[in-house]
Amino acid sequence: YNVLYIYSIEGNKLEEIERVNYSLVDIVDLNGKGTYGVLVALNDGGAQTPTSKLYLYKLIDKLECVYEKSYDGACVVLEYGKVAKNQTGVYYVRTSDYSKLNAELLLKKVSGGFEEQMTSSFTYLNTASGFSNIIKDVDGDGVLDVRTLVAPVEDTKRNVAEFLQVWKSWDGDVGLDNVYGLIENATDGYDLVLPKDWLGTVRYQYV
């Protein structure tokens, strides 16, 4: 794991006040007004089956852990932000075997910490971007989206990066809605955007 060192500043002096172990970390504005917290995922690969923990620390008089949750599988993506127009949360993406991913959506509670809302599972297909491009705002509406990849119906030697990307957004309940479909065909030199109404049943192949 890595170590995050936290210091206080008094005049021109730095004083170490805390050390936090982490595998993934994000410094987040908890209320949009400059109240910051430290969001940490810590993986434990020592066991036969990997596990991980999610922590939220707040600096009150000292650094305090205000939320903790254990999960099966290693955390590979930790992303905090808007998950709906008026809702903030965190996507915690974990895996036990790197062939299937589980995206946990946790909603921020007014009282502090998070509340588990849903889990979505999908097959992981490795691309050059690895895990860095799985959660992002793909359509510019300010809300985080989840990327899944759909393989062609036939066996293909195409690069996985040319597979159909289906981006999904939280449906406000316990699932994800399709919002955007894209094929980036670098081999033949075109991009193809698919209407979201097609994405629930679409099948395709390269010829």
Task: Place the predicted regions along the sequence by residue.
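Acidic/hydrophobic-patterned starts of short beta strands in beta-sheet-rich repeat architectures
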Residues: Y1, G32-L42, A84-T95, V138-V150
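Structural motif
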Residues: N2-Y5, G46-L56, Y98-V110, V153-W170
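Short loop/turn segments that connect beta-strands within beta-propeller blades
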Residues: I9-N12, L59-K62, V110-G112
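A short beta-strand motif characteristic of beta-propeller blades
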Residues: N12-R19, E64-S70, M118-Y124
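Repeated scaffold domains used in trafficking and secretory/extracellular systems
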Residues: V20-L30, D72-K82, N126-K136
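Surface-exposed beta-loop interaction hotspot
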Residues: V28-G32, Q165-L192
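Extended non-catalytic domains of envelope/secretory-pathway proteins
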Residues: D72-T95, F114-E115, L182-E184, D188
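Proline-anchored loop/turn motifs at beta-strand termini and strand-loop-strand connectors
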Residues: T187-Q205
